[in-house]
């Protein structure tokens, strides 16, 4: 902090001399200005504050929103309207027990943490209220105190309002519980409002439970948790030294939205006793939406209870293009293995890469790779879902009341051992023949047993690229064309009767038409066929994804009159032909 004398010299633009030499007298105008400034400071008149650095070793720091900056109080001295509040340690290798409290009220407060190292004796290392932004520089450590008379460990950061974190690195760690009635503190705990992480490195560790109490969560928010960038590692605390305690959650929130960055969320391990279980990697009481970034969520293990889930949502789970998600259920020894992804709502995957694995169990059931009490819909991306192994029964690769597979997905579902199912819909293995017509070219769905042996598979080939145009002595040049309008009188419609594009190739007296659909119909009038025959075409082939038909133009012409229409319809692997409305 600057002294009044130093501040006066800085404002007057005059160097401060600290030696014993004799200075030349200042002009009378400067002497008068100095007297006025000093008098103003001594009588408490307002004066613009300079950006300053505050050392946490010097005492607790309280920051609130001022009129044009932050009001910062330390050791009963308040600096008004600080425009760039920086908190740091004089010795970063030694933690201070002093704490930071930020109260934005109805305004906003921004604070920079520059290599701060705090370990509270009790309670939280940093408390924020209202709309607060923490900008990180260097490597910061915020550790809550171990449980005292309350038995609950303190939080690394406690927030009531909107908390935004960006830049640098922070490790926020909850304190440990001290008895069976408390729990470990959270690395970051939001009583209300959202936690937003837009960059930097955030390590959030829940404290451990003791004598059967539960571990704390890495990040615990009563609002939402949003990650758009940076690297986030959230670890739930373990439950130790007693019966019935459960591991903390990696991330626990009302809603989780991840659009970028790298997120790793690990549930803590459960203690002993039938009431214990491993913590969930990611838990949401609403929904989980992952639209980008790389996400790894691991459920914690448990000795006597069940393993935690990789991702658990009371609402729905949506995963879309640009994201990579790995979700692993924790292992149970006496209890069941945890699930990779589980939701009371739907699970929807439209793109990206997903690996979901159920946990294993030594004496109970293996966990499911993906489980939904509503529906599972996969329409794109690459998905691998494996049931865990168990003693009583294996987990399912995917289990739901409804499994909707469509589009250009690539899915491999593996049953757990023993007796698990790869794709369990209402307790029965899904028949892949029922989904073929909903798959696009390039799609592939594989169901395997616990040993990886394929029990069902459907693969939709991509359309063969047409050859380069070449000249032909018969039937014209071999020139591919796509839109139907390029061949007047020949149209192709989809299963709903809507006109669609197709690929055509002429060569060697053959006209070949192809379309990347399971169901499609070729329409041609006999007058059009006569024109094609006059141009040297004597054979027409029609190719859909799983069916191919060859027609003789001469035979078709012999079947009807001038205005009759020929309709050739393909449906999956079967075909029907009508001429003039009559089946042939």
Descriptions of predicted regions:
Residues 17, 141, 277, 375, ...:
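Histidine (H) residue identity feature
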Residues 11-19, 439, 520, 536, ...:
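Short, flexible helical or helix-coil boundary motifs
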Residues 86, 94, 108-114, 119-121, ...:
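Long, contiguous ectodomains of secretory-pathway proteins
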Residues 2-11, 31-42, 46-470, 474-476:
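A composition-driven surface/loop motif
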Residues 1-26:
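N-terminal secretory signal peptides that target proteins for export/translocation
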